[in-house]
Every structure is written in structure tokens, then in C-alpha cells.
């Protein structure tokens, strides 16, 4: 078995070893889990996961790659992704990049090879807590010190809201609606457009 390259360390001191993909950097965030069987690209680009480390309980992630049309926002702001098995050879005629390539492009560190079912049970039983992604060789005490000293971001809206006013118009126009964009997903925009609502995003 090849040596581990990354590990995640929880506030409680628990450690999980695995292998890195995506951005090769240290990162901290609140750890949460998602039980979806498909839709990892939508999760990756969901603004409600900004700066959070998302544990995917479904065991295989990355097998259909990333497509340009399926983002929920212009760019992902997720803190990181933790998966059981990562597939770097997607099979999908629509895909344009691998999950790892996109995460590297946007500075998102990811770890695979983790027992995500056990990790999910810990989150369920102990509640959410902060976590740090570091090199596997880092001592636990040093990782916990860095986690404790890492700043906690408060203003998530600033990162995910629009910078200037923009419009999303629909052909079957019935009403104009002002959307206060605090991190609106593209699917919400599409559904409102389908109902005949043209949106002014502010």
C-alpha cells in the first residue's frame, strides 16, 4: 500500500489518513456530511457549503467528471471535500474536466481513502466541529495548534453574493422580480425563469 499523503484532524483530536487530490494546501473549516448518491458538482458549487469541509457518504466520487453546464454558481467556494474513493478517469461524454482539476484550479483541497461512513457517524453523534487538512507527516499536536489558531470566517455572504446588478430574463415573461443575491443557486434562477419571472439580481 502506498504511503498516505494527507490527513484530516478533528477538533476532538481524531485523525483520519488518506491521499490528497485537488489543491495541495493546508485548510481548515467546519466539517459536515452529504448523503447524496449523485450531484457532487452541484454540492461542490453550492454556496451554502462555503468554507465547509464536506464528507461524501457515497463511496465513489468523480466518476462522471465536471461539466460546464452543471455549476450552481460561477465558481465553487466549498472549503474541501472528503471522499472514500476518488475516480480520476471519468466516463461521461459531457465532461470537460476532472473533479481534481477543478478543485486544483479553485484552490480546494480534497482527501480520498477516508472511512467516510465512520466519519459521518462521528459527526452525527458528536455534532459538527472544525477540522484541518494537513500533510500526513505533521504531528497531531502541531495540527491541533494550527487548527485552534486558524481564523474563523464570519461574512460568507460577501464571498458568494453578486458584485454588481445583473439580469436573468425569460422569454415567457410575466413579472419582474428583484432577487437579493446572498448566494443564489443557478437552479433557483432557472425554476423562477420557467415560471415567467425575470430577475434583477442585486
In which residue ranges do the predicted regions lie?
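RNA-binding accessory domains that recognize and position tRNA/RNA substrates
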Residues: 2-197
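Conserved small/polar residues in nucleotide/adenosyl-binding loops
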Residues: 200-202
Amino acid at each position: 500500500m502506498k504511503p498516505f499523503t494527507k490527513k484530516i484532524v478533528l477538533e476532538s483530536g481524531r485523525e483520519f489518513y488518506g491521499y490528497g487530490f485537488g489543491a495541495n494546501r493546508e485548510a481548515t473549516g467546519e466539517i459536515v456530511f452529504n448523503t447524496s448518491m449523485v450531484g457532487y458538482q452541484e454540492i461542490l458549487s453550492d454556496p451554502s457549503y462555503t468554507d465547509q469541509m464536506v464528507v461524501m457518504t457515497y463511496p465513489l466520487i468523480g466518476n462522471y467528471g465536471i461539466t460546464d453546464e452543471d455549476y450552481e454558481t460561477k465558481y465553487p467556494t466549498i472549503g474541501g471535500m472528503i471522499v472514500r474513493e476518488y475516480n480520476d478517469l471519468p466516463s461521461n461524454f459531457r465532461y470537460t474536466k476532472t473533479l481534481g482539476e477543478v478543485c486544483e484550479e479553485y484552490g480546494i483541497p480534497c482527501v480520498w481513502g477516508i472511512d467516510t461512513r465512520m466519519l459521518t457517524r462521528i459527526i452525527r453523534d458528536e455534532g459538527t466541529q472544525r477540522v484541518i487538512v494537513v500533510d500526513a507527516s505533521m504531528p497531531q499536536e502541531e495540527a491541533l495548534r494550527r487548527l485552534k489558531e486558524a481564523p474563523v470566517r464570519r461574512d460568507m455572504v460577501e464571498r458568494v453574493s453578486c458584485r454588481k446588478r445583473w439580469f436573468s430574463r425569460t422569454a415567457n415573461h410575466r413579472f419582474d422580480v428583484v432577487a437579493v443575491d446572498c448566494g443564489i443557486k443557478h437552479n433557483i434562477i432557472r425554476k423562477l425563469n420557467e415560471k415567467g419571472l425575470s430577475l434583477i439580481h442585486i
